[in-house]
Amino acid sequence: YNLKSKKTLILFFALAMVASACSSAAVPCDEVEITTGENGLPDLDGCEFTFAVENAYLPFNYIDPADGEGKGWDYDVFNYLAEEMNFTPVFVAAAWDGMIQAVADGQYMIAGDGISITDERDKIVDFSDSYIVLQQRMLVAADNDSISSAADIQNGDFKVATQKGTTNYDLAVSLFGADKVDAYDQFDFAIAAVISGDAAASIVDEVAGLGYMGANKDKVKLVGEGLQTDPLGFAFPDGSPLVAVVNEGLAHMKDNGKLQEINDKFFSPGFTVSYDDIAEVTYDE
C-alpha cells in the first residue's frame, strides 16, 4: 500500500463522487422519457418541473412568513400532481408582468397564477384543459353604496383599479375606457387602492374576490352580476409534451374529487389569509 496506490485510490473516489453527482442531477421534465406508473398515470421518473408563480396572488400562491413556505391553490395542486406522477416540483417566483412571455420563451415549463385562457395568449403559449370557469366581478369598498353595476361607473366620475397585463385590465378598459382605469403591478395594490378610496372599484376574478373577502368582509364586497366568463388553465411553452401529462393529472383529480377538495379550500370565503398576512416578494431581474 504505497503512496502511488493511495493517490490512485483517492482519485478513484473523487471521480466516483463526480460521476454520482452527475448521475443524480435531476433531468428537466421536458426532456425525460415518460412512462406509465402503477396508478395508470404518467410517470416522470423524478424529473424537475419548473413552475412559475407570482407568490403574491391570493388564493393561488403566496409566501407564509411564519415558515417561509410557498402556499396556496397552485402549490396544493402541483404538489399533489408531483406525488401522483413522480416529478419534483420547482416553484420559481416570477413577476406577473412578463410571466406568460417568459413561458413562451421557454424560461419556465409551466405557469400558474390563475391564468385566463384567451385566444391572444394562445398564440404564444399552449394551455392545459381548464380547471375552473369563473366570472369576472366588481369589487368595491364595503361601505360603498354608490356602485352596484358597471353602468354606475360608466355614467359616473369613478376610477377603477386593476392589475397590469390581466384580462381584468382588458375588460375594465373595454367597459370604462383607459382614462378611468389605473393599472398596478400586483393585485393587492389594486385592492389597497379600493380600500383607501383612491379607486372606487376593481374588476377581479370571482374566486380571487371570494378568497380575499374571507379575511376582509368588513373592508370590501363583490357587487353586480358577472361581467365576463373566463376559463382558467396552466400555460406551457408552445408544443410542450407536458400539456398532455398535466391534463391527465387534472382529469384524475376531477375524477377522484381531489380538485374539488382543493377548490373548496381556497375558492371560498372560508379562506381567511389576507395580503396583510403574507410575506413581501422580490423578483430577480
Name the predicted role of every residue range.
Residues 24-39, 167-184, 222, 251-285:
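Ligand-binding clefts/hinges and TM-proximal coupling segments of bilobed small-molecule sensing domains
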Residues 18-21:
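C-terminal motif of bacterial Sec signal peptides marking the signal peptidase cleavage site
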Residues 73, 90-102, 147-148, 182-196, ...:
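Short helix-initiation/N-cap motifs at beta->coil->alpha
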Residues 55, 133-140, 206-251, 269-285:
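Periplasmic-binding protein-like
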Residues 61-65, 78-86, 168-185, 213-217:
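Ligand-binding cleft/hinge of the Venus flytrap
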Residues 29-114, 123:
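Extracytoplasmic small-molecule ligand-binding "clamshell" domains
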Residues 98-101, 114-123, 171-174, 195-229, ...:
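A ligand-binding cleft/hinge motif common to bilobed small-molecule-binding domains
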Residues 141-159:
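Flexible hinge/capping segments at coil-to-helix
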